[in-house]
């Protein structure tokens, strides 16, 4: 199965056009996928005391978090689609990792190391920004991929960033969508 984690509040956005491009391609190929639309789901990214108590025991009272965990545990491919705001992913995506990627699900504590709990062989990160990709490569390629994703078993990472997403030309955005359709 393919999981798509979408982290943008507007369905009128270029990020949503990216999501539609990916899902249109998957539908055309008859591939099974599940979209996790964090904003549409009204996902609460704030970890409160109750969440923390359950997190430490590897559980949750949230049916939605359990559903997200189930989707991820069945997925071999994961897409992340999000804008880069203030140099990193939106807070809702950070909260998704904080609350969903629990011990016993996303990872296990070994004697000497963390053992990944997920078995994702292809992880596609699609971002939008106004600045050049090189500015964000230390965050995405130097931290997010090796320390956040690989640690929990999201491997085979590919990153695609649409620079000048808001100020670039329509042709620029259409070319990016065509590129995404070719790799989806």
Regions found by a protein language model. Give the residues of each.
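N-terminal beta1-alpha1-beta2 submodule of the flavodoxin-like/Rossmannoid cofactor-binding fold
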Residues: 1-105, 109-110, 167-184
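Structured loop/turn residues at beta-strand edges in well-structured enzyme cores
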Residues: 73, 91, 118-121, 155
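Cofactor-binding loop segments of dinucleotide-utilizing enzymes, especially the Rossmann-like FAD-
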Residues: 7, 38, 127-128, 162
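Glycine-rich phosphate/pyrophosphate-binding loop and the adjoining helix
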Residues: 134-135, 139-184
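Glycine-rich, flexible loop/turn motifs
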Residues: 51, 114, 156
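Short, glycine-/small-residue-rich phosphate/pyrophosphate-handling segment
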Residues: 108-151
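Short, structurally constrained coil/turn elements
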Residues: 27-29, 119, 153
């Amino acid at each position: 199965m393919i999981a798509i984690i979408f982290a943008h509040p507007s369905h009128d956005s270029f990020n949503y056009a990216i999501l539609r491009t990916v899902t249109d391609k998957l539908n055309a190929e008859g591939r099974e996928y599940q979209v996790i639309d964090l904003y549409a789901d009204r996902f609460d990214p704030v970890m409160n005391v109750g969440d923390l108590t359950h997190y430490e025991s590897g559980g949750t009272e949230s049916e939605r978090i359990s559903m997200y965990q189930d989707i991820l545990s069945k997925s071999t491919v994961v897409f992340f689609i999000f804008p880069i705001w203030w140099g990193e992913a939106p807070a809702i995506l950070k909260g998704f990792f904080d609350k969903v990627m629990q011990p016993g699900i996303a990872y296990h504590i070994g004697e000497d190391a963390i053992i990944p709990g997920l078995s994702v062989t292809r992880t596609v990160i699609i971002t939008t920004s106004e600045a050049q990709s090189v500015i964000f490569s230390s965050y995405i390629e130097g931290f997010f991929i090796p320390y956040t994703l690989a640690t929990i078993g999201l491997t085979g990472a590919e990153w695609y960033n649409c620079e000048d997403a808001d100020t670039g030309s329509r042709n620029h955005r259409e070319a990016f969508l065509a590129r995404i359709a070719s790799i989806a």
